[in-house]
């Protein structure tokens, strides 16, 4: 609307349908901010920054650094579209008392250039909107994981394994696929989290002593 209004103010007869046709034409190249960021980063210099990032979380899980490393690689693989047949079906869970900066750690996982793709406000009550988040965000933090009820945990397990998001337009009957970019991480102050023990293999539990992101 704003584009067509500005055009009309300049004396250009451009209506909403004209703007829509232009934006969806070959004259406007596709822009993917995460692909551009990864391209600009350049070749790896050999320094292990992922395990160093994981090391900021002091926890009781002896496998934490390696599991976080694999999860992180899978997250980036989603961004690049390396494997479109499988979802990043695991999620780290940071468990510890309030004030241990669990959410702060989750935010700094993404570089500043990509933090617009971070959210901690997903609502599992709206299944269509929650599924839309798979293609809208790069990292979804399930803050206060212990507040999710049994049925919502079942739906979360479903989301974790989905390679794409299946969406229906408002008032429409056609379902279209949207590429998935999002991976999940969670935080909680409580240790008693998982209502369905069969789904526990999808979560990397990390009981935190203290987290020290800088």
Where would I find each of the regions flagged by the language model?
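Long, basic/Gly/Ser/Thr-rich N-terminal segments
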Residues: 1-33
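P-loop NTPase catalytic core of nucleic-acid-dependent motor ATPases
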Residues: 25-135
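C-terminal regulatory/interaction module of P-loop NTP-utilizing enzymes
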Residues: 117-128, 191-200, 211
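AAA+/SF3 P-loop NTPase mechanochemical coupling elements
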Residues: 130-135, 169-187
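Conserved AAA+/SF3 P-loop NTPase catalytic/coupling segment centered on the Walker-B
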Residues: 139-160, 194-199
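Conserved catalytic/switch belt of AAA+ P-loop NTPases
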Residues: 154-176
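Canonical AAA+ ATPase core
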Residues: 180-197, 202-207
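Residue-level detector of conserved catalytic or cofactor/ligand-binding positions
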Residues: 206-214
């Amino acid at each position: 609307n704003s584009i067509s209004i500005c055009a009309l103010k300049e004396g250009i007869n451009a209506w909403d349908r004209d703007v829509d046709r232009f934006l969806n034409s070959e004259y406007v190249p596709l822009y993917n901010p995460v692909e551009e960021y990864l391209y600009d980063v350049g070749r790896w210099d050999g320094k292990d920054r992922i395990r160093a990032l994981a090391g900021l979380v002091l926890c009781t899980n002896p496998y934490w650094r390696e599991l976080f490393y694999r999860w992180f690689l899978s997250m980036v693989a989603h961004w690049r579209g390396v494997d479109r047949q499988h979802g990043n079906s695991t999620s780290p869970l940071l468990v510890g008392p309030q004030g241990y900066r669990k959410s702060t750690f989750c935010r700094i996982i993404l570089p500043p250039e990509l933090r617009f793709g971070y959210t901690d406000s997903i609502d599992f009550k709206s299944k269509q909107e929650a599924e839309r988040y798979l293609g809208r965000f790069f990292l979804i933090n399930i803050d206060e994981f212990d507040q999710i009820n049994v049925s919502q945990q079942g739906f979360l397990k479903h989301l974790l394994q989905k390679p794409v998001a299946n969406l229906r337009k408002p008032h429409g009957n056609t379902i279209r696929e949207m590429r998935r970019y999002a991976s999940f991480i969670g935080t909680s102050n409580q240790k008693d989290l998982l209502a369905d023990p069969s789904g526990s293999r999808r979560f990397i539990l990390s009981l935190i002593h203290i987290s020290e992101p800088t």
